[in-house]
Amino acid sequence: MPDAFAPQTLDMALQAISSQISESVSAEQIPLAAAGGRFLARDVCSPKDVPAHPLSAMDGFAFSLSHLNKADTNKPLSLRVTGKSLAGRPFEGFADPAGCIRIFTGARVPEGFDAVIPQERVGQSTSGEQVEFSTEGISPMANIRQAGEDIAGGAVALAAGTRISPQAIALLASIGIAQVEVMRSLRVAVLSTGDEVADPGGPLPEGAIYDANRPLLMELIRAIGADPIDLGIVRDDADSLRHHLRHAASIADAVITSGGVSVGEADHTRAVMQSLGEIAFWKLAIKPGRPLAAGWIHNESGQRTPFFGLPGNPVAAFVTFQGIVGPCLQRLGGATPVKQPTVRARLARATKKTPGRTEFLRCKLTRDAQGDWRAEIAASQGAASIKSLVDADGLAVLPHDAGPLAEGAAIDVLLLK
């Protein structure tokens, strides 16, 4: 474990805490209709091939290309229509390989038939009992969805830890799954600290600010599939904070605070955390987001509840949640961590940078004449400037060891939109 009170790189900090976090929630069985947004507790394997039989991919005529290829195929074929196959009402009986079957999209292809000719390429007799067409460009299995083409029986349809999206709901339904085993939703307690913080909608005392962090963090928690527990605002009092943190740890799987983690006289979080449990690290070598505490709150039975003390400035709280807290919560909840989408871009202008910390700068993205991304660093980079975060397309990542960067330097940009 690195020195808890020396600034940690983002990677070192994430490793220090995530390596000691393991899945902590139990599994439960729920109806598929209620499973959206939840995380699978175990792999789901398909009980059968999907589709179960070869199906036509379009309206037309099914026939045996392999049988007819034995004849002279330079001339148009003239075949007798011997039956019909519709979706849900397949052709039954013997399909004469010297003839063809009228078939519609989604209908089962008769056994022994291995191609479908689109109806627009077919000429029909007045009675519809005879058709004529050329097989030019038609290969075996043309316009046929083969059995197991979407997913084979016994194959893993969705892996454990997958978040169940609308598309995943459709896949599970297509293989006949009506009940799924998912992880219980992770419960995350959220509270703000500080005498200067007030709830939105109420009066704003002189020198106070409305609490933007708690709503921000609760929405970020929901976005990763966990359930936030709103514990309100705790004033700058060590005993009160200790009481609230103990309570939070008793009802939640993880605890997040914002504010109270710098070195001000009224910032009690560090001392309280040391009295309640242990601290993995206290500072990050990043900007914004340097003052971030992470550790565990211990209870009397020896259980440990992960704790994250985020900075009071909203942009710093956002950056530290995305870089540290979110991945740890996903691991805790049994989810497969999802990395934030990233693009490679070039700086639109030279940018100042101090070696020894990773910087996350709000930026706008445009395409240059060659179609490559260009990152224009926003003028406002204050850690309290929420509007600049809303307006940004992404966060330009300036590497830990880099110094000043020249115009055109290649960087990663974490996408926000």
Regions found by a protein language model. Name each.
Residues 2-5, 62-230, 235, 374, ...:
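Short, glycine/charged-enriched hinge/interface segments at domain edges or termini
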Residues 1-73, 102, 146, 335-360:
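Short, low-complexity N-terminal leaders and the immediately following helix N-cap/first helix
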Residues 5-12, 27-30, 34, 58, ...:
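Conserved active-site and cofactor/substrate-binding residues in soluble primary-metabolism enzymes
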Residues 18-25, 43, 109, 155-161, ...:
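Structural signal for hydrophobic packing residues in well-ordered secondary-structure cores
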Residues 17, 60, 154, 190, ...:
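Residue-level signal for inorganic ion chemistry
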